Amino acid sequence: MKCNIGVIKGDGIGPEIVDEAIKVLDAVAKKYNHEFNYTRILMGGESIDATGEPLTQEAIDTALAQDAVLMGSIGGNTSTSPWYKLEPHLRPEAGLLKLRKSLNLFANLRPAYLYKELVGACPLKEEISKKGFDMMIMRELTGGLYFGDRKTVTENGVTTAYDSLTYSDVEIRRIAKRGFDIAMKRRKKVTSVDKANVLDSSRLWRKIVEEVAKDYPEVEYEHMLVDNCAMQLVRDPAQFDVILTENMFGDILSDEASMVTGSIGMLSSASLNDTKFGLYEPSHGSAPDIAGQDIANPIATILSAAMMLRYSFDLDKEADAIENAVKKILQDNYRTVDIMSEGCTKVGCSKMGDLLAQSI
């Protein structure tokens, strides 16, 4: 199979971790007789340095011409980087928001899985962590508060800021359908998270989710208020399969879920549109403080590449091969510094990539 993959290396540790993901993808291509072609795309700080913009129209057009895009990380040190002296719409992260909108990437998938080899890194009580958990957070990505109208005004010496949260039934229906479709391939349970006791947008969210649920009689579903969900994620994460929610709630809950796994360096992410196209990236940031030191954990990016094979190319067997390689390396007690524990062998970013490529 021939696959055209856009590559955004990005900032900070981005180039290092993407290189290791490509190393593993090349091992997959060799074993399973595929052809993966890579095209570089500039975004974020590296694009600002080269073009003065965090994302150019040329970069968007190049991304649209690919079958999928694999990304490292975007951004720098907000205190010291000159990028953050620019206007907000010219900063690195603005490029990512623009790309998501331009590519209509409305569905964000963030798995949170506790590997049994990493239970010791989980911050939860042992009676909770020993049960393990395996959930998928499905976050609506192009609507809601982050994309609503906003303004700040000063009248009579009082400054007031406004942000608007808007969702249409069309936006809710398409993300709900995607969430239920994902649940059908998992344990067939959806928890729809909202704030319907306060927000009109959440009341519409709940109404549309209930309508969509009727088309999936095999899927168990429930509604949960976002504050309760935040509590349940630390009280009993094993209860969740697919968490379906809007943009801001998903942003917060997915970060919370990532931390109860013990290392955000292990967690992948996919952003999908209504075709097979997707943007795949690690859940963690650019970690500029450790960039260039060969100590970053590339596993989240490598697992993002596995998600790309599964969701954009329907290469389930190949995705399984990457995921099984990660499990094997953990069982063999190889660790990067962020997940290091007593009795294990510490390896750097490039060595971890080598080990995983060899395990394919």
Locations of regions flagged by a protein language model:
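Buried hydrophobic positions in well-ordered alpha/beta secondary-structure cores of metabolic enzymes
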Residues: 11-14, 67, 138, 179, ...
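N-terminal beta-loop-helix "entrance" segment that forms/cooperates
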Residues: 33-57, 231-233
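Glycine-rich phosphate/pyrophosphate-binding loop and the adjoining helix
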Residues: 142-143, 147-186, 190, 196-198, ...
